Amino acid sequence: MTNKPSRYTITSALPYANGPVHIGHLAGVYVPADIYARFLRSKGENVLFIGGSDEHGVPITIRAKKEGVTPQQVVDKYHVQIKQSFEELGISFDIYSRTSSKIHAETSSEYFKKLYEDGKFIEQTSEQYYDPKAEQFLADRYIIGTCPKCGNENAYGDQCEKCGSTLSPSELINPRSTLSGEKPVMKSTKHWFLPLDQYEPWLKQWILEDHKNWKTNVYGQCKSWLDQGLQPRAVTRDLDWGVPVPVAGAEGKVLYVWFDAPIGYISAAKDYFKNSEIKAVHKNNTWEDFWKKDDTKLVHFIGKDNIVFHCIIFPAMLKAEGSYILPDNVPANEFMNLEGDKISTSRNWAVWLHEYLEEFKGKQDVLRYALCANAPETKDNDFTWRDFQARNNNELVAIYGNFVNRALVLTHKYYDSVIPALGKLEASDEGVIMMLKEFPAKIAASIEQYRFREALGFMMDLARLGNKYLADTEPWKIYKENPERVKTILHIGLQIAANLAIVSEPFIPFTSAKLFTMLNLKANTWNNAGTIDLLKAGDQLGTAELLFDKIEDATIEAQVKKLEDTKQANLLANAEVKPLKENVSFDDFAKMDIRVATIIAAEKVAKTKKLLKLTLKTGIDERTVVSGIAEHFEPEAIIGQQVSLLANLAPREIKGIVSQGMILMAEDADGSLKFVQPAAVVNAGSMIG
C-alpha cells in the first residue's frame, strides 16, 4: 500500500481450542500483533485487532474423545481459558471471537454458497478410508498403523510421532481405525475443491512481483510452493463436527477447517460491529469498511506453519469471492523452541501461559519483554529460563527500573516530588535532548517494518540514555553546592521517563501504565513523544514504586526442574521395552532362590569405578556380594535398604573378592538403576516367588 491507510485490520492466527496457549504461540503471533496494534492506536490510527478461537477440525474431536466429552464441551472449556489468559497478558484484541458461534456458521456458509453459485469450485470423487463398524469416514488422525520407515506400530495417518516422518494413510502397514479398532476399507466420497492451480499465475504476480518487501522467510516459502505448482485443495471433508456444507447432497460433510477458520476473521468483525456504539469508536466505520475498502491495510500475524494458508490459499479465496481486500503484509515468524528442544503439546514440552500467569503474578511484562527480545523473526529461536532471568535482572531491573527509580526518588528527596523547573542547559543536556528526539521515530520505523526486536532494543536504549545521563551528571553529589543544576538534571530525567512511558506502552503496557501514574502524566500519544514538554514544572508526581524486582535463582531452578521432570516422564513413556527372552520351564525357575536381604555395609571396591562391595543380612547368614552399581549409588546412602537377592547363584571371585549371589536391579529408560524391593519392610530372608 503506497498511500496512507485510513484504517487497519489486524488479524492474529486463531489458536486451536483443544488446549491452552504456550510461549511459542505468544512469541510467534500474539505479542508482535499486540505491539503493532497498540503502537498504531497510540498514533491515533483507526485499528481493528481481531482474535478468536479455531473450534473446528479433527484436533478438537480427538481431544473430545480423549477427555470423554463432546467437542462443544472441549471448545467451551479451552475458549474461556485462552481468552482469559490473553486478557491477563494484556493482548488488546478489539474482539476475541470463536468459530463455533452462530454468526460464524452463517458467514462461512454464505461464503461457501457464493463461491459455489459462482462456479468457483470443482467436484471430485476420491477413495478414502472408511470404518464400516463406526459408519464413518476416517480423517488421517483416526487411522493408526505401522510406520513404513521405523516400524512404530502406532503411527498416525499423517505422521509418525516416533521418527517424525510425514505419512499418508495409504502408506501405513496394517492400518486400523482408532474408533473401533477394525481394519478400514476404501470407499468413494465426493468433495468440493478450490482449484488453486487456476490462481497460480495471479498469485505469482501478486506475491513474487508485487510483494517483494515481505519478510525473506515468508517470501521464500511462498516461492517454494509456487515453484512446485499448486493443486486443487478440498474445501469439504467427511466429519460430524464443523460447519455443515450448505448444499443439497452434502449430508455428513463439513467445511474443511482451513477454509472456515480464516473466514473467522470476517465473522468476528461482523460480530464486533453488531454493537451500534462500536461504530463511534472507529470513526463511524462498519465491518465492511475494515474488510472491503481499498484504503484499509490488512495485516495477518501468524507462525510459519500458517504461511501457505494466509499467503496463498486465503488470498485465493478472497480473490474468488471478489469483494474483499487482500493482505498488505503477512509478517510470519519462525518457531520458538524451549531449552534447545522443539515445543510439543503432546509431550507437554512447553511453558503454558495460564501456568506462567499463576506462578509469576504481576510479571506479565517480563514475559512480553523476554519473548519480544528473543523473537524468532527470521529463524527459529530458543527460550531458556536463564535468559528470561537475565533479561529481567540485567535489563528491566538494572536499566529501565533503575533509571525510573533514581529519577523519582531523587525528586522526592530534594523537591518533595514536585517537578523542578528547567534551568540553563549545558552542552551535555542539549546532546541528550537531541538524542531523545530521535527515539520515537526510530522505534516507529522498526515497528512499521515488523522488526519488533529492533524496536524493543531502541526502547531500551532510551532507558539506557536516561540511566547514563543521571550517572554522568551525578545529581546526588552536587546537590549541596549546585541545587539549581540538579533541578535541570532531574527535570530532564523526568521528561525522559515520561517519553519512556509512551514509547514502551506497546511492549510492556502494565509497566507503562504504572509509570504514567507515578509521573501523573496525562493522556499522551506517540505523536507527543520526543520532546521535553510532556511534564510541567511545579506539578506533583505520584508515589514512586519499584517497577521490576529481581528474579532469584531458586525461582528459575524450580522451572528448570519442572521441565527436567517432564523430559524424564517422556523418556519413561516412550521407552523401548526389550523383547521377551526364550521361555524357561517352571522347574528351571523353581531352582532359583530369590529372597529379601538387607544391606548392612557398603564400600567402593578399590581401583574400580563401577563396583560396590555389599554386606547383606539374608536371614540365614551374612554374606558379601559385589555389585556393579557404584555409578548410581553412594555407599552410605544405601545402608539399611532391602533388596532382592538371587541367593543360590554360584559364588565367583571379582577383583579378589568372593561374591555370593546377585542383587536384582531394574534399569529405567534413562539408564538409571533402581532396586527391586518390597513395598514395605519385611523380614530378611523372606522368599520371593
Swiss-Prot record:
Which GO molecular function annotation, any one, does this entry have? Answer: ATP binding
Task: Write down the species.
Answer: Cytophaga hutchinsonii (strain ATCC 33406 / DSM 1761 / CIP 103989 / NBRC 15051 / NCIMB 9469 / D465)
What is the stated purpose of this protein?
Is required not only for elongation of protein synthesis but also for the initiation of all mRNA translation through initiator tRNA(fMet) aminoacylation.
Per the record, what are the reactions this protein catalyses? tRNA(Met) + L-methionine + ATP = L-methionyl-tRNA(Met) + AMP + diphosphate
Q: Does the keyword Metal-binding apply?
A: yes
The UniProt entry, under CDD domains, shows: Anticodon_Ia_Met, MetRS_core
Per the record, its GO cellular-component terms are: cytosol
* Cofactors (names): Zn(2+)
How the cofactor is bound: the record states: Binds 1 zinc ion per subunit.
Q: What name does the UniProt record give this protein?
A: Methionine--tRNA ligase
Question: Source gene?
Answer: metG
Q: Which family does it belong to?
A: Belongs to the class-I aminoacyl-tRNA synthetase family. MetG type 1 subfamily.
Keywords from the named record = Aminoacyl-tRNA synthetase, ATP-binding, Cytoplasm, Ligase, Metal-binding, Nucleotide-binding, Protein biosynthesis, RNA-binding, tRNA-binding, Zinc
